[in-house]
Amino acid sequence: MAKLHITTWGCQMNEYDSSKMADLLNSTHGLELTDKPEEADVLLLNTCSIREKAQEKVFSQLGRWKNWKKDKPDLIIGVGGCVASQEGEHIRDRAPFVDIVFGPQTLHRLPEMINKIRGGDRAIVDISFPEIEKFDRLPEPRAEGPTAFVSIMEGCNKYCSFCVVPYTRGEEVSRPVDDVLFEIAQLAEQGVREVNLLGQNVNAYRGETFDGGICTFAELLRLVAAIDGIDRVRYTTSHPIEFTDDIIEVYRDTPELVSFLHLPIQSGADRVLTMMKRNHTALEYKAIIRKLREVRPNIQISSDFIVGFPGETAEDFEQTMKVIEQVNFDMSFSFIYSARPGTPAADLPDDISEEEKKARLARLQQRINHQAMQFSRAMLGTEQRVLVEGPSKKDIMELTGRTENNRIVNFQGTPDMIGKFVDIKITDVYTNSLRGEVVRTEDEMGLRVVESAASVIARTRKEDDLGVGKYVVNL
C-alpha cells in the first residue's frame, strides 16, 4: 500500500487540518499514514508562520527531503499551511523539487493536485481562499479516542499589528451550524465525550442556520452541550473584544462547558495593547474575568503573552506582571516578540536587547509556573472528574486522563475505563502531572442523557405568526 507522511508544525488548527488531509487521501488514494518519512510515497509539510525564522525552518526541512526525491523520482512533496500561503511561488523558486504548494483553505483539493502531478503536470501552486468549500469536501470525521477537535470557523478580521493570520488564513468564515452539529454528533456516536471547538477567533462565530438566520457562538455552545454523549466542551482561541455577556451566561447554566478558559491578553500595558491594535484595555480584560468568576468562581484562565514587543518599556512589562498576578493565570503560552514579514509591527524599531527580552520572558514564565503549581497543590486531597484517554506514557500498566482544568492525572485502573469518566482522589502533585486513586466509575455517576443533534435542531425550529421559520435557542 502506498504511504503518506505528514510533518505538522504549529497550532491545533494545523493538527486538525493534518488529520483531515490524512483521512482525505486515505479515502481517495488509499494512502496509509506512516511516521517514517523515508517510507512515504507522498510527503506533506504543514507549516506555521507564527514564530521567528519560520521560512528558513521550512527550507531546512525540505533540504532533508530533497535527497529522498533523488532516490525516488516518483515521490511527491507538498508544502501547506501558513508559510505556504505567505510564500506561494517563492517556495518553488528556492525548492524547485517541491511538487505542490497549497494553503490552509485549499487542502481539500489535494487529491486533484496529486492526480495532476502523477498525470505529468510539472507543479501546482494553489493558495486561494475559497471560503467554506474546504469543509464541504472533507471526509466524514473519524474519532481517535474520547476527545476530538472540531473546526467551527477559520480566519480572523482583527488584524492585530503583530499577527499574520488574516493574511495566511483569510478573514473570518463560519461553518453552518447544522454542519458543525452533525460532525459532533457523528463523533459522539464513535465514542467522543469531549469536543474542542477550533477557530482563530471562535467567539466571532456567526454560523448560518437552516432558515437563513444566524447562530451566535453562545447559542452554538448550548447546542453542542445538549448533544447526547458530549459531556465536556472546550474551545480555542477567543478574543477579548468579542467575549460578550451572552457567552458569560453560558457558563452560568451549562455545566458541560469546562471551567477552564484560554483568553489571550498578550500584554498588561495599555500603551502596548494600543500598538498591538488589540482594541481593548487591561481593565476591560479584567472586567471580563471578573464577570466570569461571578458565574463560575472556580474558573481557571490561561493566556498568551508577547514579551519584548517594539517599544515595550520596563514599566510596561511591570504592568504585564501586575495583570498576571491580579488575574492569577493558571497557564500561558509566552514568547519573545519576533517580527512577521508583512505585518504592521514589522516596521516598528526593535529597540529592546535580546538579553532583556530573555530576562523578561524568564521572569514571566517563572511567575506563571508558580501560580500553576499553587493551583495544582490546591487539588491535593480533592476529587477530580477525569476523562480517561488511555495507557499512561510513563507506565503502560497505568491509565492517564485529564481533569476539567487540563491537568494530566495518572492512576491505576482497568482497560474498560478508557474513553469514560472516573472520579479520582488526588494523592500526589508533580510539576507536570498529578497522581490519584479511583473513587467512582462512570456507572456510579448518573451522567445525564438528553438528546441527539437532530432532535436539538428539530426542537429549535419554530415559526412566527406568518408561518415563517425562525431559529430559537431555548435549552
Swiss-Prot record:
Residues 2-119 form the MTTase N-terminal domain. Gene3D superfamilies: Methylthiotransferase, N-terminal domain, tm_1862 like domain. It comes from the Bacteria. Pfam families: Radical_SAM, TRAM, UPF0004. PROSITE patterns: MTTASE_N, MTTASE_RADICAL, RADICAL_SAM, TRAM. GO terms for molecular function: 4 iron, 4 sulfur cluster binding; metal ion binding; N6-isopentenyladenosine methylthiotransferase activity. Its cofactor is [4Fe-4S] cluster. It catalyses: N(6)-dimethylallyladenosine(37) in tRNA + (sulfur carrier)-SH + AH2 + 2 S-adenosyl-L-methionine = 2-methylsulfanyl-N(6)-dimethylallyladenosine(37) in tRNA + (sulfur carrier)-H + 5'-deoxyadenosine + L-methionine + A + S-adenosyl-L-homocysteine + 2 H(+). [4Fe-4S] cluster 1 binds at residues 11, 48, 82. Residues 377-440 form the TRAM domain. Residues 142-374 form the Radical SAM core domain. Its main location: cytoplasm. GO terms for cellular component: cytosol. Belongs to the methylthiotransferase family. MiaB subfamily. Monomer. PANTHER family: CDK5 REGULATORY SUBUNIT-ASSOCIATED PROTEIN 1 (PTHR43020), MITOCHONDRIAL TRNA METHYLTHIOTRANSFERASE CDK5RAP1 (PTHR43020:SF2). Catalyzes the methylthiolation of N6-(dimethylallyl)adenosine (i(6)A), leading to the formation of 2-methylthio-N6-(dimethylallyl)adenosine (ms(2)i(6)A) at position 37 in tRNAs that read codons beginning with uridine. This is tRNA-2-methylthio-N(6)-dimethylallyladenosine synthase. It comes from Actinobacillus pleuropneumoniae serotype 3 (strain JL03). The gene is miaB.
